Amino acid sequence: MLNRKSPRMLGFDFASARIYFVTINCNKSQHILGEIVKNEDSNQIVLSEIGMIATEKINELSSHHAGVEVLEYVVMPNHIHMLISLQKLVKTSTLSTIVGSYKSGVSRMARQAFPGLELWQASFSDHVIRDENDLLTHSEYIRMNVDRWQKDKYFIKA
């Protein structure tokens, strides 16, 4: 069995009240959540069935996890960005358990329509929001992500 090194910062309290910028990637960077359609002056994401499930589950996060609020999010063809606000959580709830349950819930629903689908890359990326300026920067990044798709570091021509 392969022992993966955790990307989580050792000794950091991921159950503490903070805001996190989270990125969840699709397995092998597959474009399975939707596609970007170019309009005259902007781009638009057209969600696939799986992308709609992912969006539905994002909107349910706060009802499944007390103290969790998704401030902003964007579903892209091969990844998702979220700004997640955590109030002080119970010891069994951390950012990792919340994201893990989200990924499991989306996968479970998606596999009903697409049996055997390997939807997600292992783990996820996170950034602790440090101040108001950092929050504004990441919030704008999320809002502009669809329009900047061709310049995005996760962009892979489908």
Residue ranges and their predicted role:
Residues 1-158:
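Short catalytic/metal-binding and nucleic-acid-binding patches
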